[in-house]
Amino acid sequence: MEEFDSEDFSTSEEDEDYVPSGGEYSEDDINELVKEDEVDVEEETHIIKGTKRKAERFMPRKRKQGGLSLEEEDEEDAGRESGGSGSEEEDTATEQEEGTESEDARKKKEDELWASFLNDVGPKSKVPPSTPVKTGEETEETSSSNLVKAEEQEKPKETEKVKITKVFDFAGEEVRVTKEVDPTSKEAKSFFKQSEKEKPQPNVPSAVSSLPAGSGLKRSSGMSSLLGKIGAKKQKMSTLEKSKLDWENFKEEEGIAEELAIHNRGKEGYIERKAFLDRVDHRQFEIERDLRLSKMKP
């Protein structure tokens, strides 16, 4: 037994290189071998194709009919370069032409707009030839003359007022009062009517004087004269009116009418205080009235 075992162990190394004959292969072994062969073939084809592509990339020259075509390639490259430069020059020329055309069109538009603006503004800004240019002195003279004319026109408006003289009887004395009023006022109209009535009547014609002395015409004229005297009786003036008249005359003589008016319009003036007290009384009356009305309501 020991010898058999030693022989088996000695022959184990030789079994590694042992290849059985074709009849001893199984179907599985054959399929595996076929697959391995196909994989090896595919790998070889891939390697061959890769080497061909690399060779095509690194080939510096082309062969045409067994000869080198370096000169033809140089000519083609030069033609391409010249064609590229020519196309670039054409592009730049076309761009320049388009730029000049756009500038010309822009200038034309600006000129048209300026011309239309001048047409719109031109006739208004023109100075009429008939009117000469005035200097500063002439303008001052014209302005001063215009002011004088305006003052002259305003003067008659101010002097349109009419002076009225009224005669009053105060304690047997005759008092004359002069006023300046508008001609359209009631006092002026009444004064004009009264003055017309007081005018002397014209002489009676000769035909009337030839009548007998005992006629009724003389009686009528005598009665009218008596009625006129009665109508022309002087109006009486009260003491209050006389004092007021004297105060107005004093203010005019002293020239203090404006100062008194300004003082009276102030807070310390008598008129302003009186108006304030009147407003207070009126307000107090309104408050009392509201209270009475509120109490009367149910």
Swiss-Prot record:
Renumbered residue ranges of the record's region Hydrophilic: 177-216
Compositionally biased residues, Low complexity: 124-134
Note: Gene duplication of the ancestral BCNT gene leads to the h-type BCNT (CFDP1) gene and the p97BCNT (CFDP2) gene. The latter contains a region derived from the endonuclease domain of a retrotransposable element RTE-1. This repetitive sequence associated with the BCNT gene is specific to Ruminantia.
Basic residues: compositionally biased ranges: 49-65
Organism: Tragulus javanicus (Lesser Malay chevrotain)
Free-text function comment from the UniProt entry: May play a role during embryogenesis.
Acidic residues: compositionally biased ranges: 1-18, 25-43, 87-102
Domain of life according to the entry: Eukaryota
Claim: Phosphoprotein is one of the keywords in the record: yes
Name this polypeptide is given: Craniofacial development protein 1
Phosphoserine, modified sites: 82, 85, 116, 215
Compositional bias segments (type: Basic and acidic residues): 103-112, 149-159, 179-200
Ranges where the record places region Disordered: 1-159, 179-223
Xref: InterPro entries: BCNT-C, Swc5/CFDP1/2
Keyword Phosphoprotein on entry: yes
Subcellular location: Chromosome, Centromere, Kinetochore
N6-methyllysine, modified sites: 218
